[in-house]
Amino acid sequence: MALSALLELSEKEYDAFASVHPYANFLNSIYSGRKFALLGWDVHYVGICRDGEMAAATLLVSVKLHGSYRYFYAPRGFLLDYADHELLQAMCQGVKQFAKERSGLYLKIDPYVTYQEHDQDGKVVEDGFCNQKIVDDLQSCGFAHQGFTRGYDMANQCRWMSVLDLRNKDEETLFQRFDAQTRWAIRRAQRNQIKLTQAGPEKLPDFMRIIDHTAARRGFDTQDETYYRELFQAYGSQVKLILAEMDLSAYQRALRKEQMQKQTELSEIQGYSCKRARHQKMLREELDQLQQKLREVRQLELYAQEGKVLMGGGIFICYGQEMIYLAGGTYGRFLHFHPAYAMQWHMIRAAKHAGMRGCAPIISTASADRLRKIRMVMAYLPSSAVFMRMSSNCWETF
């Protein structure tokens, strides 16, 4: 089967191939190309055909270095079958030649290929897959692997992702596969009247206050507001800004309704048996807790705007067959209301309804200790897996 030379593609041609490819990712999408263009990079879409059908493609961006030289980058690597060595070799040679003709000095790729499967504690899964051969093949094509780096690095793409597979599972199956603590927290958030709303870029200042608070509390770096505004500008409707708010009036009504039910139940079991005495004690303790929550409402009113208290938020990106939880946080004083659980369960359901195959939060470090610290709801799921991706940089020099 004959392979073509490297072809320049239109944005439309590239998107038709990329959006349905197994290695599709928001970072190798046309929306990513638009974002690079906003930042002043040159943007190209190139590919190779086999017998008239597109077989490989990539987003290729470049920026000027010193003199006339340019740095080239293929975000999340090439979209092709990495097991097809002939195609991989042709793509590598074609892209290298393309860059060389345009004064390329360096070419970097960070393939969106799972290297090895790990469990939720960051340990290698026995009998799990390992794609070392792809690393070897890329090296044979002239790339130099920079190693499986560890730690948090804002300059490079994440290497660890916790992935929830949504295929062949309905909502009830997904929910029941959560651990007991997660199911309890989701139900508790619903009882706490946590409501989820999708907002536009006008709400980014509110989101930034949340994410900056969370970053300071948890000790991680974050992007500035300009970064997220550029996301909205480039990705449009693919970006979902979700805000988790408490409906204060609904919460207060729910507490008073539960209080009345407990009081009625208590009055109906007045008696002297040991069993009833224990039940009465439990009800009185629950009534005390409800009264404390009602007093807490007065404090919550200090944070309310138009009857709602903003507690948390997150930014998600939908592209291809996956939804990525890019960034999010919760005000520390509201953690016990579990807004993050409500938000992530809401978006898992949204991804399922949209027919996506997976949902994943980005985990930007390879430290097992750090993994345990930063993983959120989806990382607690027994049905999720942690993958180390082959995104440690591969460099080609010319």
Where are these regions (language model features)?
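A conserved beta-strand-loop-helix scaffold within acyl/acetyltransferase catalytic domains
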Residues: 4-68, 114-116, 121, 131, ...
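Acyl-donor binding region in acyl/amide transferases
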Residues: 68-154, 311-313, 317-387
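Secondary-structure boundary/capping signal
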Residues: 103-106, 170, 239, 355, ...
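A structural signal for short, well-ordered beta-strand segments and their strand-loop junctions
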Residues: 105-110, 195-199, 243, 358-362, ...
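Glycosyltransferase-associated regions of secretory-pathway enzymes
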Residues: 267, 271-273, 283, 383-389, ...
